[in-house]
Amino acid sequence: MVRKYETVVIVQPDLGDDELKGLNAKVTDIIATMKGDLHRLEDWGVRKLAYPINKSARGRYYYVRFDGDAALIAELERRLRLDDKVLRYQSVKIEKETAAPAAKVAPVETAPAAEAAE
């Protein structure tokens, strides 16, 4: 059964461009080989980690959104687990599409001088 998934991968922050392109190619190849449908692959950049992982305080985040079955998730996570450059990964099944949350706008308060003038 084909379902929607998203995966966040944290890799070492000091990887070169060739290694990053190799990681991108690896993920897209796994999804294509397992007959999945890749929707989005985003590089979120280097960010500070909440706690050190393998003596690293920073990590480069990647967001992957795709359609596939359980075998695809199992293979993707197995291959990520074996890669030394990957610090952490987390895959989540998307139950239903949610619209982007609307931006919260703070209510405008009337100035005390404007109230006194009325």
From Swiss-Prot:
Residues 98-118 are annotated as: Disordered. It comes from Geobacter metallireducens (strain ATCC 53774 / DSM 7210 / GS-15). The keyword Coiled coil does not apply. CDD domains: bS6. Binds together with bS18 to 16S ribosomal RNA. Pfam families: Ribosomal_S6. Residues 99-118 have a biased composition (Low complexity). Keywords: Ribonucleoprotein, Ribosomal protein, RNA-binding, rRNA-binding. The keyword Hydrolase does not apply. Belongs to the bacterial ribosomal protein bS6 family. NCBIfam families: S6. This is Small ribosomal subunit protein bS6. It comes from the Bacteria. InterPro entries: Ribosomal_bS6 (IPR000529), Ribosomal_bS6_sf (IPR035980), Ribosomal_S6_plastid/chlpt (IPR020814), Transl_elong_EF1B/ribsomal_bS6 (IPR014717). HAMAP family: Ribosomal_bS6. GO terms for cellular component: cytosolic small ribosomal subunit. GO terms for biological process: translation. GO terms for molecular function: small ribosomal subunit rRNA binding; structural constituent of ribosome. PANTHER family: MITOCHONDRIAL 28S RIBOSOMAL PROTEIN S6, SMALL RIBOSOMAL SUBUNIT PROTEIN BS6M.
